[in-house]
C-alpha cells in the first residue's frame, strides 16, 4: 500500500469507498468494469526459479534493446474484456482511442467503468463516449491501486508472459492473446470477490 494512504484525506476517501460505495457495488457486480493499463515488453523473463540445494540457479535474461508496450483491458465479473496493446506509453489520445474503439462497444446501459485517478483518464471526450452508451466513469480514491481487482489479473498475465519469453512484438501480441483466453468466469468473479466487490 502506498505511504500516501496514511494521509488524512486519502484515508477518508478510502473509508467512504469501503463503507458507502462497495456495499452498493456488491449488489450489482455485473455492471462493474475495472479498467487499468500495465506495461509489457519483449525482455520479460522469469524472475525466480529452482535449483538443487547448494547450487546457484543460473538463467539467461535479455539485455540491451527491447520494446515496451502498454496493455489495456477491462475486468468484468465474468471475463477480461476489450484487451488491447499500444506501442509505447499511455497518452490521453491513446486512452480516448481505446475507450471509443475497444471498451465502449462492450458496454451496456448502467455499466460503471472504475479506474485509477490519473490525469490521462480524465478525458471529457472519453466520458462523453461512455455517456452515449449509458455508462460512466468512477474514479478510485487516490493512491489506491490495491482497490482495483484487475491488478490481480495483470499479475497472472505478467507471470505467463515471463514464461512465454516473447522477444518480438508479434510474439508478444500472440502471447497476450493466448493468455487473455485463459481467464475463466469463476476466476474473474474471484478477483472481484477478493477485492470486496462481489459476495458469495
Model-based region annotation:
Residues 1-200:
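Short functional hotspots at interaction and active-site rims
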